[in-house]
Amino acid sequence: IIAASGGHNVLLIGPPGSGKTMLAKRLPTILPPLTLEESVEATRIHSVSGELQPGMALLARRPVRSPHHSASTPALVGGGSIPQAGEVSLAHYGVLFLDEFPEFTRSSLEALRQPLEDARVTIARAHATVSFPASFTLVAAMNPCPCGYYTDPRRPCKCTPLQIDKYLSRISGPLLDRIDIHIEVPGVPFSALRSQTDGTPSSAMREQVLAARDRQRHRFDGNPI
């Protein structure tokens, strides 16, 4: 709810089966709807990129992009001889979900720093420089170690301290600094998940997010924030 209310980037760290992917996929369901201005701008990007579905005039929902960790740097942030928008721009005003975060190439991860800082991507070529908007909420998920079970009480970890350090070092400090919220997601037995019946529905969470954003608009009314 905090991430959705403030547009904060999130890093989820936990063993396999802890629900990281499920949490990430539920975030878009509690985000407020696109405004008309946001919808027009996001639709333009999808249209010029050939991503707009036939017969769709405007995007009705916030875009959610989840590229595979094998995606190249140009595919992620944009590029090519004729510059094209990448996943970060296709996620404009929406969510960019990066599962297996450390498995992306170092160059791809470092290329995320500019859009996370400036909400734009600049692609320089010999004949021109092109800038694409990229204001998105990053949701990244990763295991705590190569085998995935370093923090899981259900299974022993097989990794050495050196392997764990090397794995975690794939994500640089400057990139981590741009991710506002880091959450450790503990491993939970499936039986425990099934027994939970008193959870808060997405509709109720969305109302809380809408109320929080409304308070923010009133609080900063007249300020260029």
Label each region the model flagged:
Residues 14, 78, 100:
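The Walker A (P-loop) glycine that initiates the GxxxxGKT/S ATP-binding motif of P-loop NTPases
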Residues 83, 107-225:
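Basic, amphipathic alpha-helical bundle interface domains used for macromolecular binding and assembly
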Residues 93, 99-101, 111:
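Walker B catalytic acidic pair
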Residues 10-54, 118:
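Walker A/P-loop
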Residues 1-10, 124:
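Peripheral, non-AAA+ core regions of ATP-driven protein-machinery
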Residues 1-3, 57-63, 68-96, 129:
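Conserved alpha-helical scaffold flanking the Walker A/P-loop in AAA+ ATPase domains
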Residues 98-105, 148:
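Catalytic P-loop NTPase motifs of RecA-like helicase/translocase cores
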